[in-house]
Design a protein with these regions (language model features):
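Generic detector of short, aliphatic-rich beta-strand segments that form the cores of beta-sheets
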Residues: 1, 153-155, 208-212
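Ser/Thr/Gly/Pro-rich low-complexity, disordered linker/stalk segments of secreted
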Residues: 1-41, 51
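Short beta-strand segments and strand-loop junctions that repeat across beta-rich extracellular domains
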Residues: 173-182, 208-210
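Surface-exposed loop/edge segments in extracytoplasmic proteins
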Residues: 181-189
Length: 219
């Protein structure tokens, strides 16, 4: 696992600084990710490899295409894991996806980029939590905001750190809520909860992710 630990780095670098392969505007650097991808692919295990980015906002067409090319050259399935940390550098969310599938989806949709941001415990997520508690019977609701609006166009393995106190953890339900149209739809997914309290699930859609422990029911 490359990258210096926060304890070993100089105090001038904030603990939540983006990784070295992320450019000034928060976009993944096409040149740097190309190098990272080639290195990862050459060290692939069982035909699989992964590149990490931390606190990136977007990954664009050029970066995705560079990853897809590196993967194709060695016939390796290459994933990108985009991690979001809190101010102390602790990972609170991650989005993992196949770089080639993402490159194809972005080209097909003409969107030019995938948005990688994930918000937890912000004004936005608190407003949506209040909205759902006002209109629905569900007592236990956790909300995460993905920067990606609408469909990703490919499967994303998401992990988010949410407080599941009082939730029935054996019966979690996931929904995508589109604030612009004020509509929600269920995300059909299996899920796991790891030792660090991250909830892992799959989604093909972004927007707000609503996690609850019963089917959403109107008051």
């Amino acid at each position: 696992n490359s990258g210096s630990s926060s304890s070993g780095s100089s105090s001038s670098t904030p603990a939540n600084a983006p990784s070295a392969n992320v450019g000034a505007g928060g976009a993944v650097s096409a040149a740097k990710i190309s190098g990272d991808a080639k290195k990862a692919v050459s060290n692939a295990k069982n035909g699989k490899a992964n590149v990490n980015v931390t606190n990136a906002k977007t990954v664009g067409t050029a970066a995705l295409n560079n990853m897809a090319k590196a993967a194709a050259k060695e016939d390796v399935a290459l994933t990108m894991t985009a991690k979001t940390t809190d101010k102390n550098g602790v990972v609170v969310a991650s989005l993992k996806f196949d770089a080639t599938k993402a490159a194809e989806a972005v080209a097909k949709a003409g969107t030019k980029e995938v948005k990688l941001g994930v918000e937890l415990n912000t004004k936005n997520t608190k407003n949506v939590t209040s909205l759902f508690k006002k209109w629905f019977k569900n007592k236990n609701i956790a909300v995460v905001k993905m920067a990606q609006k609408g469909e990703f166009g490919f499967t994303v393995e998401a992990a988010v750190k949410v407080d599941l106190k009082n939730f029935n953890k054996n019966n979690l339900k996931f929904y995508s809520y589109d604030a612009a149209t004020n509509t929600y739809k269920e995300i059909e997914t299996k899920y796991t909860i790891d030792a660090k309290g991250l909830v892992h699930f799959n989604t093909t859609v972004g927007n707000y992710i609503i996690i609850t422990d019963a089917p959403i029911a109107s008051k």
